[in-house]
Amino acid sequence: MFVSVDELNTQQAKWIDARFSLQDSGEGRRLYNESHVSGAIYWDLLKDLSDMSKKDGRHPMPEKDALTELFRRSGLELDDLIIVYDQGGSPFAPRAWWFLHYAGFQHAVIALEGFDELQAKGLPVDTLEPSPARSAVQPVWNEELYASREFVEQTVAGDTGSRLVDARSAVRFRGEVEPIDPIAGRIPGALNFDWEQLKEDGRFHADATLREQLASVVKPEEEVTVYCGSGVTAAPLYAMLKQAEYPNVRLYVGSYSDWISKEDAPVEKG
């Protein structure tokens, strides 16, 4: 999941640059063009890691065929060491990592360091966009990591035994403020763990205190389904739960924005 590059054989790695800005959708690509880890492929949140033609929330999940094509043109194989990075302390590398995890890439990790820190550590950088040899990789999808809308509906009805955990801020969770989606509130029955709590001084951390905070919301032996507004900021919460050795975790990629897209979908406030 989250790993310092100091612990990795970076010379044998394949790199994915997932930098992005929700406020400026072109920023990640501009930063990549200015400088990136040598050999890194750029994956864009909107163009590669979402299917914006769909109506299933604000960052809908791409079809498996599209993800397979992304992996193949990126030259990836299932047994590759793949290091994904972004600005550091952001949700975009975890989002990219989750798709790799879902597809069966067992050695994909999220760099704890953002690009500036990677460069400061002396990793080679350049402005060249690589053209990797196309692979014929065949993903091995693990559906136990994915929560469909139907699964979440069954969870709300009490039929799955999974615990919903909302990764948004407490004020959005309670429905007091909603700056993005048209309906304020949360999916009924959800608990709350603000993804910003996963960070310390702008960097993800996984110490004993954080594990205690997570366990105070949901126990490791419970099955957990995480969501946020659009499936982006829930990805680091998913990754951190796995880091904390929670064995049964799912991600509702459509998240709250998908949930409220259905007329008369129930929501809770307070």
Language-model-detected regions and their locations in the chain:
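Cytosolic catalytic domains that perform sulfur/thiol-centered chemistry
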Residues: 1-270
